C-alpha cells in the first residue's frame, strides 16, 4: 500500500470535514420576552376628579324663565368650573357662559364670561392672573393692572355660581370687610344671621348673607351647612335663583 498517497487523501478528507463544520451557521438564540417588570408602563392620563355639579332655576317676576348649570372638576392642584346660564326674555334667548380656574383654595387664576347678561346687553370679558399682575380683556382690548392682595373674579350678578364661589372664597380667606373684584369693582359681603324654612315637611336652617357692589342695590343669598347656594334674590332686577 502507498502510505504517502493514503496520508494525502486523509489530509484532504479531514480538511473537507473541518470546512463543512465551520460552514454550518450558528442557530439563532431566541430573545427572551421582556417581563412585566421590565416593560415600561404607558404614561397615565391626568386624573380629573368631578368635585361638584348643580342646577339652578331662574325666575323673574316670580315666573320661571330659564336655568343655570355648573360643574366643578379638580385636576391636580387646580379647580375648573364650567357654567351655562340661559333664560328667555320676551321670546328671545339670553345665553351666557363662564369658565373659572383657581387653586384648590379658590384663589383665581383665570376667568372668562361671554354672552348676554340681559336681553339687549352683551358681555365678553376675561381675566388672566399672573404672579404680580393681572391681564384684563374687554372684548378685543387687553390691559394690565397690579394684582390685588386679595380678590375674586366676577362680572355682575350672573351667573349665580360665581357668587356662590365668591362667598366661599371670602369665608375661607378671613372674611374681609371689602373684597376687590376683577375685572373691576369691589364688593361688601355681610353675614345676616340664619333663617329656618320648612322644606318637604321638615325645618331646615340656612345662613343668610348680603352682597353689595355687583349690581345696584343689595342682593340676598342663602347657603346650607355645606356652603351650597340655595337661593339668590336680586331685587333691583326682580330676579330669583333657586337651587333645584
Predicted regions and their residues:
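Gly/Pro-enriched, hydrophobic low-complexity segments
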Residues: 82, 86, 95, 99-101, ...
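Bacterial N-terminal signal peptides that target proteins for export
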Residues: 2-14
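Transmembrane beta-barrel architecture of outer membranes
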Residues: 67, 95, 161-166, 218-220
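Bacterial N-terminal signal peptides
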Residues: 12-24
Amino acid at each position: 500500500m502507498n502510505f504517502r498517497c493514503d496520508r494525502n487523501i486523509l489530509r484532504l478528507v479531514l480538511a473537507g470535514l473541518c470546512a463543512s463544520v465551520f460552514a454550518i451557521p450558528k442557530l439563532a438564540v431566541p430573545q427572551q420576552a421582556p417581563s412585566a417588570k421590565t416593560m415600561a408602563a404607558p404614561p397615565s392620563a391626568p386624573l380629573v376628579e368631578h368635585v361638584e355639579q348643580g342646577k339652578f332655576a331662574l325666575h323673574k317676576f316670580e315666573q320661571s324663565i330659564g336655568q343655570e348649570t355648573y360643574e366643578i372638576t379638580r385636576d391636580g392642584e387646580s379647580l375648573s368650573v364650567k357654567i351655562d346660564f340661559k333664560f328667555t326674555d320676551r321670546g328671545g334667548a339670553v345665553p351666557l357662559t363662564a369658565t373659572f380656574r383657581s387653586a384648590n383654595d379658590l384663589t383665581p387664576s383665570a376667568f372668562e364670561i361671554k354672552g348676554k347678561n340681559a336681553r339687549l346687553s352683551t358681555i365678553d370679558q376675561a381675566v388672566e392672573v399672573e404672579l404680580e399682575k393681572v391681564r384684563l380683556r374687554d372684548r378685543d382690548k387687553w390691559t394690565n393692572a397690579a394684582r390685588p392682595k386679595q380678590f375674586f373674579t366676577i362680572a355682575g350678578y350672573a351667573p349665580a355660581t360665581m357668587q356662590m364661589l365668591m362667598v366661599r372664597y371670602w369665608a375661607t380667606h378671613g372674611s374681609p370687610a371689602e373684597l376687590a373684584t376683577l375685572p373691576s369693582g369691589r364688593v361688601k359681603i355681610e353675614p345676616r344671621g340664619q333663617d329656618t324654612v320648612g322644606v318637604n315637611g321638615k325645618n331646615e336652617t340656612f345662613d343668610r348673607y348680603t352682597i353689595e357692589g355687583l349690581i345696584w342695590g343689595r342682593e340676598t343669598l342663602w347657603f346650607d351647612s355645606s356652603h351650597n347656594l340655595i337661593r339668590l334674590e336680586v331685587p333691583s332686577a326682580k330676579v330669583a335663583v333657586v337651587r333645584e
